[in-house]
Amino acid sequence: MPSGELADARTALHAQWDRLRSWVSDVVDADVGGEPSVLEGWSVAELVAHLGRAMEALAVCVPVADGTVPLTFGEYVGTYVARAADIAETTRELAREIADDPLGAVDRSAQAAFARLDELGPDDRVVQARRGPVLLSTMAVSRVLELVVHADDLARSVHRVAGSGAGPDPIEPAALTLVADTLLGIVVARGGWDLEVADERRWLRLAAGRTPYDVDELARALHPRYTSEGVPDLGRMLPVL
């Protein structure tokens, strides 16, 4: 039967992509693209190219044999760390390759991703992704995660460029909620705490390693579900990405 989780992820992915794509078109011109981003060693243009690379990861997914055990969401995103240098180099090469028409190339990757998502759905199933077998819903949510995290990276990057207007918020609220809750789910599954997100963007930045870990920041980002409890020290678990 169709998966509600997959349907929700599909809706969030479309909404986040549409919002971010419109924002990039309005805000990121050639001058801004050449500026350094908030991610050390990455330009704004390379971040834009990475959006296409992120969507391409969904486009290349294929079905796997029945009985294949998928990675959990936490296990899947946990593979990012070991490939960080490779991801950065691949992105730089891609940015050079598509320099003449970066948005056209990114659009083609997104179109292929959504076409593959429709082809593989609407039932949730295990698919082979670049880093291992995952549920299609896991893959879709991971793409929402990529777009939300990098939308925030791009917005903060453009804010730093003198004389440049950052425009409206490129993050879709429902997509941010989905991502924040999913990242919290990874932490809760590992530690068993009963926590809830109090500040979605602050939590996103902590969990994604965009903000240095600080217990006061964590206490603003997360709250215990019951007032008799406190927020645990998650210094050994963060960042998740």
Regions found by a protein language model. Give the residues of each.
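Structured surface interface patches that mediate subunit assembly and partner/cofactor docking
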Residues: P2-A9, G34, P63-F73, E119-L241
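Active-site-adjacent scaffolding segments
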Residues: M1-V127
